[in-house]
Regions:
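Patatin-like phospholipase catalytic region
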Residues: 1-18, 40-44
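A residue-level signal for conserved active-site and pocket-lining positions in enzyme catalytic cores
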Residues: 5, 28, 169
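Alpha/beta-hydrolase-fold catalytic nucleophile elbow
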Residues: 5-6, 31, 74
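Non-catalytic peripheral regions of patatin-like phospholipases
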Residues: 9-11, 19-24, 46, 52-185
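Active-site glycine-rich loop that binds ribose-phosphate moieties when present
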Residues: 25-40, 51-57
Length: 185
């Protein structure tokens, strides 16, 4: 099984993608390290934070490492927001959403541009080019099922809350699945 875990290098904000054999306890801790809640995690002498700041998720490396041309992207953080956030809590929540969605939006735009260029130029010569050209990206958005959660919910590890999240995830998956699953998304 192939596994990718990303962390953000604090020094320059670059994404670090760790593949299966390079994944350690420190890498996993860094990949979820929110700097306002925990100090940076040291990996080989360099401090790292949550990978979501630089790649959320690292789609292009995932496509490059994958053996399939189909990727299912499950998006938990809302991209759209109605109304103007006014209170400190609302503003903080929306800023967090924008911050963690920005890398994904940039990667999806880059993939779209690459697919357009590859289509114009014909058969790509690189392995990654061929993978991008044939990529079928399916998008399951769970934002309608998690948007009402407070920012503090990321710290909630109670079993009842976790099973509630699981149930919401299942509802989002059921809404996404249809007779056309795998054909159109």
């Amino acid at each position: 099984m192939r596994l990718l875990v990303s962390a953000t290098r604090v020094q320059d904000g670059a994404v670090r993608v760790f593949r299966t054999k390079a994944i350690s306890l420190e890498v996993v801790l860094a990949s979820a390290c929110l700097p306002r809640l925990h100090h940076a995690v040291d990996i080989h002498g360099e401090p790292h934070w949550d990978g979501g700041y630089a790649a959320n998720p690292p789609v292009i490396p995932l496509v490059g490492a994958s053996r399939t041309s189909e990727v299912l992207l499950i998006q938990l953080i809302p991209t759209d927001h109605t109304g103007l956030p006014v209170t400190k809590a609302e503003i903080d929540k929306r800023l967090g959403q924008i911050t963690f969605n920005a890398p994904l939006q940039k990667e999806l735009e880059a993939i779209g541009m690459m697919k357009t260029l590859l289509h114009k130029e014909g058969q790509p010569t690189s392995r990654l080019g061929r993978k991008i050209q044939s990529l079928q990206l399916h998008h399951l958005s769970a934002e309608d099922y998690v948007d009402d959660l407070s920012q503090a919910s990321v710290l909630d590890t109670k079993w009842d809350f976790l099973t509630h999240l699981r149930d919401r995830g299942r509802a989002a998956a059921e809404a996404w699945l249809s007779p056309e699953a795998g054909v159109r998304s």
